[in-house]
A protein has these predicted regions:
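Alpha-solenoid helical repeat architecture
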Residues: 2-4, 43
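WD40 beta-propeller repeat blades
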Residues: 8-12
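Alpha-helical repeat/alpha-solenoid scaffolds of the HEAT/ARM/MIF4G superfamily
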Residues: 22-29, 33, 37-203
Length: 203
């Protein structure tokens, strides 16, 4: 599948960034635009099909690869975040991340939103919420992965992080208000997720 192929390519790029940064350096300017496009387009799809999925979307069959592993947007998001982690951990590539910090944080917070599935599960069992949200939890999710990446960025770029995070939070709060005032059922039912994710990002 297209998602599976993108995931495999991102995993390969991550290995190259970590192990042969000198060889990758001349190619980074060509690699980053399609990776960024994948991150942004996948965010729209993830929010629509996972975060705000309706009951009808629950019937979609899972796609598996040749190894029997489920190939989904979650796996693609994990691969994107691992690639960004690799850039942050490699001194040669950190300036590339720093340059687009505010926009990157905006999309990370999008991925931090509670999904309908999580909301239903946690409403029925509050103890499960406490367990899943614990930093030592064995339940790894896009929400937790997003928090991990945001923490890594703030630790690496302390000074820039404050301004970028403030801009990100304000942007999400503004868009949440616009959603709530949109007059649509989807907007009214989902705008709170933006606000919750923004508050979560503040820690």
């Amino acid at each position: 599948t297209d998602t599976g192929l993108k995931t495999a390519i991102l995993k390969a790029l991550t290995i190259l960034v970590k192990n042969v940064p000198k060889i990758m350096s001349p190619w980074l300017s060509q690699v980053l635009p399609p990776v960024w496009a994948t991150l942004t387009s996948s965010a729209d799809t993830y929010v629509r099909e996972v975060v705000n999925a309706g009951d009808a979307d629950d019937d979609h069959e899972e796609v598996v690869d040749s190894d029997g592993e489920v190939v989904g947007f979650e796996n693609l998001v994990f691969a994107i975040f691992e690639f960004v982690h690799a850039l942050v951990e490699t001194p040669k590539f950190r300036p590339s991340v720093k340059q687009g910090l505010a926009d990157l944080m905006y999309y990370i917070v999008l991925y931090m939103q509670i999904t309908n599935d999580q909301c239903e599960k946690w409403t029925e069992n509050p103890d499960q919420f406490v367990e899943d949200e614990d930093e030592d939890s064995f339940t790894y999710s896009v929400r937790i992965s997003s928090q991990d990446l945001l923490t890594a960025l703030c630790e690496e770029f302390e000074e820039e992080c404050c301004v970028s995070l403030a801009q990100t939070i304000q942007r999400h709060l503004n868009e949440s208000s616009e959603l709530a005032a949109s007059g649509t059922i989807v907007g009214a039912e989902t705008s709170w997720k933006r606000r919750e994710a923004a508050m979560l990002a503040l820690g």
